[in-house]
Amino acid sequence: MTMKHDVKTFQGFILTLQEYWAQQGCAIVQPLDMEVGAGTFHPQTFLRSLGPEPMSSAYVQPSRRPTDGRYGENPNRLQHYYQFQVVLKPSPDNIQELYLGSLQALGIDTQVHDIRFVEDNWESPTLGAWGLGWEVWLNGMEVTQFTYFQQVGGIECSPVTGEITYGLERLAMYIQEVDSVYDLVWTDGPMGRVTYGDIFHQNEVEQSTYNFEHADVDFMFTLFDQCEKMCQHLLSLDKPLPLPAYEQVMKASHAFNLLDARHAISVTERQRYILRVRAMSKGVAESYYQAREALGFPLCK
């Protein structure tokens, strides 16, 4: 039974996207329970895009980018925000039509509004990943990123995975016609109206203060080294453990992002740290591929 959700609330907006993509055959999975900078880090995207096994999924992913914090003073810059990620493997021929259908489900008339696909190829140096892509502009504002993964963890993607990443806050601000993310209505029900600011404003103030002023630099350097060491250990076992090793990659990546926010890494060092994360990602990708291959790629029917 299809329920009609109020897309003029952030809650209803997310529920509508989930329901739409579920109807297209996606598994609606849950967010990763770790600090990541983007939905692409979720194993459902990074790891599942490797090898021949088909997989279509969709999920909300809380994302953290410490350097983007503004102490809750900027109406559209956040250090913690939400992405809605759709991963389609193999990428269907009608992926753009499916995306436009999701906008229609959100009440956006694609015949009336100016919707443009602007070429913007994507790259993630830390994940050793890149793809051909497009930004989707709605009346002159970027709201979504399309990517066709060509390579992940240094491994060629075959078949190609199609990824759609919605910027939830930005798209919701457009739908609700508000100028500040904190004015977004999260829900408006029997218990009263709750805004995005009611839930997250204090968090933005405090986390920005931590990210820029109090994150322990020495601890973060040590944490990065320890995560790298553990990742290498897990991959060197007689029976490697690529999934736990990948968690170490994500922890190291977040430690790096906090060091970046604290201005603790020089330009030269920054590149070296990116290459260290990339080397870990590549090792995980190769190990994961080999593990699935040893199982006979069980999702291939």
From Swiss-Prot:
A Pfam short name: tRNA-synt_2e
SUPFAM superfamilies per the UniProt record, alphabetical: Class II aaRS and biotin synthetases
Enzyme class: ligase
Record's keyword annotation contains ATP-binding: yes
Subcellular locations according to the entry: Cytoplasm
TM ranges: none
EC number from the UniProt entry: 6.1.1.14
A single cellular component GO annotation: cytosol
Keyword Protein biosynthesis (UniProt): yes
A GO term, aspect molecular function: ATP binding
Cystine connections: none
Xref: PROSITE patterns: AA_TRNA_LIGASE_II_GLYAB (PS50861)
Protein family membership: Belongs to the class-II aminoacyl-tRNA synthetase family.
Family matches, as PANTHER family: GLYCINE--TRNA LIGASE, CHLOROPLASTIC_MITOCHONDRIAL 2, GLYCYL-TRNA SYNTHETASE
Self-association and partners: Tetramer of two alpha and two beta subunits.
Designated name of the protein: Glycine--tRNA ligase alpha subunit
Species annotation: Shewanella denitrificans (strain OS217 / ATCC BAA-1090 / DSM 15013)
Lineage: Bacteria, Pseudomonadati, Pseudomonadota, Gammaproteobacteria, Alteromonadales
